Amino acid sequence: MLMGSIARRYARALFSLAVEQGRVEPWNDALQVLKNAVEGSPDLRDVLSNPVYSKEQRRAIVEKLASALKLEREPANLLFLLGDRNRLAYLPAVVDTFRALADQHLGRLRARVTSAVPLDAQAAQAIADRLSQATKATVLLDRAVDPALLGGVVAQVGSLVYDGSLRTQLEDLRKTLKQ
C-alpha cells in the first residue's frame, strides 16, 4: 500500500510536468523503455535496489543508463531522484502509474488479449477495432499467449472480460451435456 501511494506521488508529479510541456507520449515511451531495461537485467536491478552499493556507485550507473537510453532531462531526473532517495525499487510502479495517467489523459484503454497462438498484426488490429467499437474508446492491446486456451481469444478491458476461447466453449458444452 505504501509503495503504491509513494509511486503515485512521483508519477503524478512527472505527469503534471509532462502535460505542461506537451511531452506525455514521448515520456511515457521513454519510461517504458527504462522499465524494460531495468526489469530485463537482474544485475542492473540488483545494483539499483541493493543498499550494499553506495549512492555514488548507483548514481554513476543511473547516469550511464540515462545516457545510454537517451532520456530527456525530466525522466532522467526522476531516475536520479529515486536513486538519491533509495527508492529505485519503486520505478516499475511509478512507470505503470504514469502509463495509466497518460492513457486516461489521451482517452485510451488498455486491453489484455490472450490467445492460444501469437496473433498476427492483422488479427490484433481487428480485435483492437472491435474492442474500440464496444468501449467507444481507443484500445491498445497488450498481447499474451496461453496454449491452454486451445483456440480463440480472451480479452480483458478493465473489469470486463470477453471470453471467446475454445477452452471455455468446451467447458460450457460439457456442463450443458451433464445436465
Swiss-Prot record:
Q: How does it sit in the membrane?
A: Peripheral membrane protein
Q: What is this protein called?
A: ATP synthase subunit delta
MF terms from GO for this chain are: proton-transporting ATP synthase activity, rotational mechanism
Q: Which InterPro entries match?
A: ATP_synth_OSCP/delta_N_sf, ATPase_OSCP/dsu
- Which organism does this record belong to? Anaeromyxobacter dehalogenans (strain 2CP-C)
Membrane spanning segments where?
A: none
Q: Name the Pfam families on file.
A: OSCP
Key word Transport present: yes
Highest taxon of the source? Answer: Bacteria
The UniProt function text for this chain reads: F(1)F(0) ATP synthase produces ATP from ADP in the presence of a proton or sodium gradient. F-type ATPases consist of two structural domains, F(1) containing the extramembraneous catalytic core and F(0) containing the membrane proton channel, linked together by a central stalk and a peripheral stalk. During catalysis, ATP synthesis in the catalytic domain of F(1) is coupled via a rotary mechanism of the central stalk subunits to proton translocation.
Keywords assigned by UniProt? ATP synthesis, Cell inner membrane, Cell membrane, CF(1), Hydrogen ion transport, Ion transport, Membrane, Transport
Which family does the similarity line name? Belongs to the ATPase delta chain family.
Quaternary state and interactors: F-type ATPases have 2 components, F(1) - the catalytic core - and F(0) - the membrane proton channel. F(1) has five subunits: alpha(3), beta(3), gamma(1), delta(1), epsilon(1). F(0) has three main subunits: a(1), b(2) and c(10-14). The alpha and beta chains form an alternating ring which encloses part of the gamma chain. F(1) is attached to F(0) by a central stalk formed by the gamma and epsilon chains, while a peripheral stalk is formed by the delta and b chains.
